[in-house]
């Protein structure tokens, strides 16, 4: 694999390197040599396609950054949302934010802006970007794996709180995913090098000559490891865990108990987990679908079709696969917004602060109809992680008296919500109004 370590720029590096060898830029033969004309046709986008790609990637980058920043703000700011599962979702948002910042802009800049596809960001950025890109994708994939284990344990050990993933354990798992991702991406920090091509233009790509004659074999082994550990193993784990979860959920019943309150608590937890599982399954399925075309195009097809660089419109094919993979970082916040009322309310709250000129219908509903929100709080009772054993009895994100008036003495965030605070109510008991 070339620059990018399995995150999408490797095939582009191969394409541009081959193109630079054939096209003979700035030479009179460019319009005379049929082979060069064909390569121009394959490797150069039309001006209209360039503008379309620039517009698409610019919108994608802004949406990815904005959405994942909102996810981070909502979880970090509201203390009651700092549950074990949400800590893992926070880590996933950080990984998607890294992809948004380091993968999307730098992967297409040199091809869309400059026809000679030069590298403009210097030697240090050449090595650092390849490392950060690969690390971010590993982090995203294995965070999904940890989330699947969290949901699996919540279902399998519903009546055994000590076995569940607590917030402290979630932090340990987050640290483990970072260490693993850094170690897996570390080789790219030393093998990706800045160089000048035969035309004297700055370029960036992998150089495995450090390993001597076995460099090519080492590269193939590393590429295979990246494909297996970045995609195959995570997807296999996700399929196994969620299949087991599905079988367990739909075929199990909550055991009878003499204590009615305890039984109700277990039933509520079971139902809440059943609501959450489809959301994380959807996130995992979209990860598989979004990344599969690009990984096949990078790691599988070149092994069976070495002449892939001579395929007509290969660059268009690559942009489609790359754009689809990058769009996964945007869809996760959208899923949270659609599937979970708490995230939706938090998004509306922070969006009203960041973009005060925009009016949100649901935010108006929450702020203008406080009493209605309390009467219909089941409508807004989406729970992110109701099964964390270390979670304290839940309250609303802002505290209200029973009359529905804001109790500013007990509200840590009263200054944020001002006179018309955002209401996020957790439905734990009939008497839990505060």
Swiss-Prot record:
GO terms for molecular function: neuropeptide receptor activity. Keywords: Cell membrane, Disulfide bond, G-protein coupled receptor, Glycoprotein, Membrane, Receptor, Transducer, Transmembrane, Transmembrane helix. The keyword Kinase does not apply. Glycans are attached at residue 207. Expressed in many cells, mainly in the head region, with expression detected in the head muscles, I2 neurons, MC neurons, RIH neuron, AIA neurons, AUA neurons, ASK neurons, ASI neurons, a few B-type motorneurons in the posterior ventral nerve cord, pharyngeal muscles, body wall muscles, the intestine and a few classes of unidentified cells anterior to the nerve ring. Expression in the MC neurons is important to mediate suppression of feeding while expression in the RIH neuron is important for the facilitation of egg-laying. No expression detected in other tissues including hypodermis. Disulfide bonds join 126-204. It holds the Pfam family 7tm_1. It is a multi-pass membrane protein. PROSITE patterns: G_PROTEIN_RECEP_F1_1, G_PROTEIN_RECEP_F1_2. Residues 77-86, 150-169, 248-277, 332-434 are cytoplasmic. It is found in: Cell membrane. It comes from the Eukaryota. GO terms for biological process: determination of adult lifespan; negative regulation of feeding behavior; negative regulation of locomotion; neuropeptide signaling pathway; positive regulation of egg-laying behavior. Residues 1-55, 108-128, 191-226, 299-310 are extracellular. Disruption phenotype: Eggs are retained in the body as normal during starvation but the number of eggs laid during the initial refeeding period is reduced and satiety-induced suppression of pharyngeal pumping is slower than wild-type. Suppression of serotonin-induced body fat loss. The chain crosses the membrane at residues 56-76, 87-107, 129-149, 170-190, 227-247, 278-298, 311-331. GO terms for cellular component: plasma membrane. Belongs to the G-protein coupled receptor 1 family. Receptor for the LURY-1-1 and LURY-1-2 peptides which control food-related processes including feeding, lifespan, egg-laying and roaming behavior. Receptor for flp-7 which stimulates serotonin-induced fat loss. Serotonin induces secretion of flp-7 from neurons and binding to npr-22 which leads to induction of the atgp-1 lipase and subsequent fat loss. Acts in vitro as a receptor for the flp-7 FMRFamide-like neuropeptides TPMQRSSMVRF-amide, SPMQRSSMVRF-amide, SPMERSAMVRF-amide and SPMDRSKMVRF-amide. This is Neuropeptide receptor 22. It comes from Caenorhabditis elegans.
């Amino acid at each position: 694999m070339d620059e990018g370590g399995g995150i999408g720029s490797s095939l582009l590096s191969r394409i541009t390197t081959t193109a630079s060898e054939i096209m003979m830029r700035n030479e009179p033969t460019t319009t005379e040599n049929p082979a060069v004309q064909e390569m121009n046709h394959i490797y150069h986008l039309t001006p209209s396609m360039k503008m379309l790609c620039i517009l698409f990637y610019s919108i994608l980058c802004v949406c990815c950054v904005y959405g994942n920043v909102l996810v981070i703000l909502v979880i970090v700011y509201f203390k009651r949302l700092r549950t074990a599962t949400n800590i893992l979702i926070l880590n996933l948002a950080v990984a998607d934010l890294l992809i948004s910042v380091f993968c999307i802009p730098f992967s297409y800049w040199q091809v869309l802006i400059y026809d000679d596809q030069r590298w403009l960001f210097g030697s240090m950025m050449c090595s650092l970007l390849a490392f950060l890109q690969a690390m971010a994708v590993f982090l995203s994939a294995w965070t999904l794996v940890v989330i699947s284990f969290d949901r699996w344990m919540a279902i399998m050990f519903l009546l055994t709180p000590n076995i569940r993933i607590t917030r402290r354990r979630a932090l340990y798992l987050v640290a483990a995913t970072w260490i693993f991702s850094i170690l897996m991406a570390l080789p790219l920090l030393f093998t990706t090098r800045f160089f000048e091509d035969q035309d004297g233009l700055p370029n960036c790509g992998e150089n495995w000559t450090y390993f001597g004659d076995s460099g090519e074999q080492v590269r193939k082994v590393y590429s295979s490891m990246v494909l297996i550990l970045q995609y195959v193993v995570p997807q296999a784990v996700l399929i196994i865990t969620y299949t087991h979860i599905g079988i367990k959920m739909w075929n199990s019943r909550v055991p009878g108990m003499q204590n009615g309150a305890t039984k109700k608590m277990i039933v509520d937890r079971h139902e809440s987990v059943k609501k959450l599982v489809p959301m994380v399954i959807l996130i995992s399925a979209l990860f598989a679908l979004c990344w599969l075309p690009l990984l096949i195009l990078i790691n599988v097809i070149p092994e069976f079709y070495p002449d892939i660089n001579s395929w007509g419109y290969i660059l268009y094919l690559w942009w489609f696969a790359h754009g689809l993979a990058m769009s996964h970082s945007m869809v996760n916040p959208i899923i949270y917004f659609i599937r979970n009322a708490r995230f939706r309310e938090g998004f509306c709250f922070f969006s009203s602060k960041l973009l005060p000129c925009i009016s949100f219908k649901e935010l108006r509903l929450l702020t203008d109809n406080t009493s209605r929100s309390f009467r219909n709080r089941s409508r807004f009772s989406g729970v992110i992680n109701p099964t964390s054993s270390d979670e304290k009895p839940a309250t609303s994100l802002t505290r209200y008296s029973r009359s529905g008036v804001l109790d500013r003495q007990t509200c840590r965030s009263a200054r944020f919500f001002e006179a018309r605070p955002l209401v996020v109510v957790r439905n734990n008991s009939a008497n839990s109004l505060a």
